[in-house]
A protein has these predicted regions:
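A beta-rich soluble binding module of mature secreted/lumenal proteins
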Residues: 17-172
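Hydrophobic alpha-helical segments and their boundary regions
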Residues: 4-5, 149
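Sec-dependent N-terminal signal peptides
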Residues: 5-14
Length: 172
């Protein structure tokens, strides 16, 4: 009985981490094969696991089990070294919906919600975590134009993200 209660508690504690923020809708007609590859972090809301990092990238590739290998990499200026974190991601619902769960510390998963995406060329995306304290602007290159930056920032602000706190990442 105790083991069952602990199992239920663990499910309840970890299930909240794969939710979708209010008013945020994952993209549909998502094609994983087009999303795979290297993405540059253009901007993010601050979190301890990325604090102080520049030149941040994420590489996505297929895993043998059908999931996605996630390799995040960033440079710590204060430590003068590269930092990497490898994780795995799986679709939460249908594979044509930009809604995945990602883990860097199994068995714990967090949401990866793609809610804005260049549907033709997959050149930029807006991604959130389980709540609105997580936000990333990603692109295929290390920079995006000012107009696109403004459009993406305004879209996130309209949905309730605190875009005044965005950290714009340098890639030099």
């Amino acid at each position: 009985m105790l083991l069952r209660n602990i199992s239920v508690l663990l499910v309840l504690l970890t299930s909240g981490c794969v939710g979708i923020p209010r008013n945020v809708t994952p993209v549909t007609n998502f094609k994983l094969e087009k999303y795979l590859g290297k993405w540059y972090e253009i901007a993010r809301l601050d979190h301890s696991f990325e604090r102080g990092l520049t030149r941040v990238t994420a590489d996505y590739s297929l895993r043998k089990d059908g999931g996605v290998r996630v390799l995040n990499r960033g440079y710590s200026e204060t430590e003068a070294k590269w930092k990497e974190a490898e994780g795995r991601a799986y679709f939460v619902k249908q594979p044509d919906q930009g809604y995945l769960k990602v883990s860097f510390f199994r068995p714990f998963y967090g949401s990866y919600v793609i809610f804005e995406l260049d549907q033709e060329g997959y050149q930029y995306s807006l991604v959130s975590g389980p709540d609105k304290s997580y936000l990333w602007i990603l692109a295929r290159g290390p920079e995006i134009g000012d107009e696109l930056k403004k459009i993406l920032t305004e879209k996130a602000a309209t949905l309730g993200f605190d875009t005044d706190k965005l950290i714009f990442v340098t890639h030099q």
